[in-house]
A protein has these predicted regions:
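Extended, charged amphipathic interaction segments
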Residues: 112-134
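Ribosome large-subunit tunnel/peptidyl-transferase-proximal elements
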Residues: 2-112, 152
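C-terminal edge-of-domain segments
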Residues: 137-157
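Short, solvent-exposed beta-edge and connector elements
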Residues: 31, 135-136
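Generic, ordered loop/turn and secondary-structure boundary motif
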Residues: 66-71, 129-132, 143
């Protein structure tokens, strides 16, 4: 019996200063690719503690995430000055990812109060093929797309 090789994941961004940068990623998670992209755009550029607070507020449905790209037929909300929503499932996964990022920073010896999120993206993962049974013995495809989320933070100041 041969040994099975585990997949090797790479990051889509290059690190300018590896000594002051930390990375964390989630691979093949079952969340919406569209809402993952919107949440990643919302936390990019924030300090780590502010990003965690934003995600906690989204989970508690106190603050909304503005929808910038996937906004057709979405209701307008005064809080976001346009379409927005509460992507709770994505926020839960991303909050765990930010806690992992913070632990990586502490292990590396970085000051977590000075961390800013410099890179947050969601990529499409593999597609799981599923089918809905229909009348007269037919079936319609209903595929599920998994998501890869990667986050990088750098120490500023």
């Amino acid at each position: 019996m041969g040994t099975a090789e585990l997949p090797r994941w790479k990051y889509s961004a290059q690190v300018a200063d590896p000594a002051r940068t930390v990375k964390a990623s989630l691979r093949e998670i079952d969340v919406s690719p569209k809402w993952s992209r919107e949440v990643c755009q919302a936390i990019k550029g924030l300090r780590l503690d502010k990003a965690k607070k934003l995600l906690e507020d989204v989970i508690a449905k106190k603050r909304m995430i503005p929808y910038r790209r996937y906004r057709k037929l979405r209701a307008h909300h005064s809080e976001t000055r346009g379409p927005g929503g509460y992507p709770v499932k994505v926020a839960r996964h991303l909050l765990k990812l930010l806690e992992s990022l913070e632990a990586n920073a502490e292990f590396k010896g970085l000051d977590t109060d000075k961390l800013f999120i410099t890179h947050a993206v969601a990529h499409k993962g593999r597609t799981i093929k599923k089918f809905f049974p229909r009348a007269f013995g037919r079936a319609s495809p209903h595929n599920k797309t998994l998501v890869h989320i990667e986050v990088m933070a750098s120490e500023m100041g």
